[in-house]
């Protein structure tokens, strides 16, 4: 009898979760709240020169590159105006970036370094799309694409609604995780496929648990002065788990692991193999 009573309590919640509840995944955070994010990216790459002798200390041995970037940022979201547009102030509280070559630290010009301590304003339209990002003139002069960077940092989500077990596909634009000569920015293009695994509750909020896979490629010419250009081909694949706060509309947690393979030709030919892990945590409160 006790088992029947327990089953009668649990079964309705299970059936409700399996009965087709649909949730909307919007890029725009809910109004009137403050969200804090912490993002950590770790990258490890082996680069091997082709047609070179191998052995201790020779040019044919892999060059091991390592990189780590940590970002802490605060987003203060205001109330929507009469047209439904909403603004959010984004402050980059702390940014650190480091790089090593064969274990030895080297200086790096991280693309996010100029953001340290800066404030930007993001604008969302009534449909929840990020339509504009404004920042100090110094950031514009640095060549950083503020809109693209913000979308990358806070998470891209499908704009469609999903029920448990359903999938949605969105286009993907991923910054290449290694510094390029002259500070040039390079991107991989592809797609991400999200699948809604379950919906849970934490207090008064619904938390969507999702898996997603990514597949992106890049084929690009890299100028090398008067000597012409190098051809770089890279493919990046991977997957992630994430928790999305449905009601406050922000990424509560995510853990993404990527693998990339690439080659460079047209000069000293080389191949590369690497891994990248990006972890994010988010928390929200009323202002």
Where are these regions (language model features)?
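Positively charged n-region of N-terminal signal peptides that target proteins for export
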Residues: 1-5
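Hydrophobic h-region of N-terminal signal peptides that target proteins for export
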Residues: 7-17
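Signature of exported/secreted
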Residues: 18-287
